[in-house]
Amino acid sequence: MKPDAHHVKQFLLRLQDDICQKLSAADGANFVEDSWRREAGGGGRSRVLRNGGIFEQAGVNFSHVHGDAMPASATAHRPELAGRSFEAMGVSLVVHPHNPYIPTSHANVRFFIAEKPGADPVWWFGGGFDLTPYYGFEEDAVHWHRTARDLCQPFGDDVYPRYKKWCDDYFFLKHRNEQRGVGGLFFDDLNTPDFDHCFAFMQAVGNGYTQAYLPIVERRKAMVWGERERNFQLYRRGRYVEFNLVWDRGTLFGLQTGGRTESILMSMPPLVRWEYDWQPEAGSPEAALSEFIQVRDWV
């Protein structure tokens, strides 16, 4: 089947609705929607839940942008895209909970297609989800990765290990020499064997996010925390900001190509702190995190 951008867009709009409904049901608060238009073509729906019962901030963004020509920053690496019109669409989300025992989560699914008359379209899917705990619980990481493995299984035995490794490699802070969290799945440039297969996989990843995350939220939401745990959470959130502003390709691409800044930076935690050369107390739960987030086979 030839690529069907309209079909993908309809799925993404439904996915945004579904994820927002499930997060809202878990939290008790509602999302506020901000619809926006892009002057050069397209637009989106940014939805944010703030200061809820569980989530300090949850942002779920849908965007669909199109144009007559790709920006130079994109065609420099992919000369075959020069002279083509393009469409890019996706759903991306980040959830920052109040409770430091609940991890931060991130998910993204996206589709890109570039066309010109008389030539085959160039298209691909990308996406994934990853988990960033502040306090490590083995059963949470195992559940997260088991959900990822199970949704990959129908697409081949090698899919989960390949995209898990890609996720571990991608969400790595080179300047800190540490992982951002316990990973999950990451894939990009997916266009084989055919459109239907790739679209089905992207849908499985998008639909799998709440199955992976919400049971962890339920398990941790009643745990009691205080100033010590909150301070550590805010300190570790600094790593999240560092990764997004220094290393994340999507953030950099969006900012460099005149994307909508408010939507791009919706992933940022609302509060964060840095402290010069801070070291956790030896033997403490905070000190245990650095070992917990080391790359390993969780399932």
UniProtKB/Swiss-Prot annotation:
The active site is at residue 106. The record marks 175 as: Important for dimerization. Substrate binds at residues 92, 108-110, 258-260. One of its GO terms (biological process) is protoporphyrinogen IX biosynthetic process. It catalyses: coproporphyrinogen III + O2 + 2 H(+) = protoporphyrinogen IX + 2 CO2 + 2 H2O. InterPro entries: Coprogen_oxidase_aer, Coprogen_oxidase_aer_sf, Coprogen_oxidase_CS. A divalent metal cation binds at residues 96, 106, 145, 175. This is Oxygen-dependent coproporphyrinogen-III oxidase. It comes from Salmonella schwarzengrund (strain CVM19633).
